[in-house]
């Protein structure tokens, strides 16, 4: 939701001053990492926005990614299950990505009427998996499984689902 983006952005900005926090681990609640933004709650209202308001939303989502990248603590994404849309972006913006074989990561923006380069994907994803592979994922919205994500260099390690937080 819009509020979730703002809350996460603000959290990562505050972490710059949190000397007592040594690392950040992002994990989903339940069987999935993050399925992305609610299409009806986010995409629907975006259609009715005028350019200045749309730019404000784009800046807010971009500011979340920037806040993550400027966070002085290492950010680890512990990915199990679905990791899509904004969830895939948050995993991409993390310093390390630990996944499971059953993970499915997808950049689905073009499938819901948004640009495939949303939230900095065109900048960061090619640096992780290479230009050709990034283009494939961003153009098609195809999901990659955990083993393929490891082969492509997207995941730093593939773990058993029950130990992804332990690793």
What name fits each language-model region?
Residues 4-8, 57-60, 90:
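Hydrophobic alpha-helical membrane-association signature
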Residues 7-8, 26, 38, 74, ...:
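Terminal peptide-recognition signature
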Residues 11, 60-71:
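Catalytic-core regions built around general acid/base machinery
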Residues 36-45:
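Short, flexible, mixed-charge acidic loops at enzyme active sites
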Residues 66-167:
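Crotonase-fold acyl-CoA enzyme core
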């Amino acid at each position: 939701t819009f509020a979730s983006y703002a809350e996460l952005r603000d959290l990562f900005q505050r972490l710059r001053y949190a000397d007592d926090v040594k690392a950040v681990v992002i994990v989903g609640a339940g069987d999935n990492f993050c399925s992305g933004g609610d299409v009806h709650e986010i995409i629907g209202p975006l259609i009715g926005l005028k350019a200045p308001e749309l730019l404000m939303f784009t800046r807010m989502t971009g500011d979340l990614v920037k806040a993550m990248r400027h966070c002085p603590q290492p950010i680890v994404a512990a990915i199990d299950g679905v990791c899509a849309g904004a969830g895939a972006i948050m995993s991409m913006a993390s310093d390390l990505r630990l996944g499971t074989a059953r993970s499915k990561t997808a950049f689905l923006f073009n499938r819901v009427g948004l640009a495939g380069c949303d939230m900095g994907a065109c900048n960061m994803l090619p640096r992780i998996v290479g230009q050709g592979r990034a283009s494939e994922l961003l153009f098609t919205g195809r999901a990659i499984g955990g083993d393929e994500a490891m082969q492509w260099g997207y995941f730093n390690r593939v773990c058993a689902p029950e130990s992804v937080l332990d690793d």
